[in-house]
């Protein structure tokens, strides 16, 4: 797993292991991830959500499938599907919801992040 070096120094992340559910992984998102994992044919995969520098607002969200879980990753399970977040990204995602939406304009994973001060029009980047 790579270290994200472009992020500014932030306050230490809260002890997320003592928080009941620091990040919400919706049923709709879990169902879509399950479908994509079945298409990949690898039941060991989990969806990793991460933050990296970039985008029009300073930070951007990233999604990838990962079969490796680091010891300090947060793992959130919904309906038997796992979402992974590294501690550095988690400090920017505390209290957020990872959802999946479908509309006339398309389908996408969406992050509703209460820590974001501003977001870009497409919702892929934010500032804190």
From Swiss-Prot:
Binds 1 iron-sulfur cluster per subunit. One of its GO terms (molecular function) is 4 iron, 4 sulfur cluster binding. One of its GO terms (biological process) is iron-sulfur cluster assembly. It comes from the Bacteria. GO terms for cellular component: cytosol. PROSITE patterns: HESB. InterPro entries: FeS_biogenesis, FeS_cluster_insertion, FeS_cluster_insertion_CS, FeS_cluster_insertion_RrpA, HesB-like_dom_sf. The keyword Transport does not apply. Its cofactor is iron-sulfur cluster. Keywords: Iron, Iron-sulfur, Metal-binding. Pfam families: Fe-S_biosyn. Iron-sulfur cluster binds at residues 56, 120, 122. Disulfide bonds: none annotated. Required for insertion of 4Fe-4S clusters for at least IspG. Homodimer. HAMAP family: Fe_S_insert_ErpA. Belongs to the HesB/IscA family. This is Iron-sulfur cluster insertion protein ErpA. The gene is erpA.
């Amino acid at each position: 797993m790579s270290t994200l070096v472009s992020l500014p120094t932030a306050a230490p992340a809260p002890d997320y292991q003592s928080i009941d559910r620091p990040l919400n992984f919706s049923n709709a998102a879990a169902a879509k991830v399950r479908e994509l994992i079945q298409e990949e044919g690898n039941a060991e995969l989990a969806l990793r959500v991460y933050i990296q520098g970039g985008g029009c607002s300073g930070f951007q969200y990233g999604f990838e499938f990962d079969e490796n879980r680091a010891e300090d990753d947060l793992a959130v399970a919904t309906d038997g599907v796992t979402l992974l977040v590294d501690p550095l990204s988690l400090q920017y995602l505390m209290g957020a919801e990872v959802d999946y939406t479908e509309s006339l304009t398309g389908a996408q994973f969406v992050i509703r992040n209460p820590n974001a001060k501003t977001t870009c029009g497409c919702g892929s980047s934010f500032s804190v």
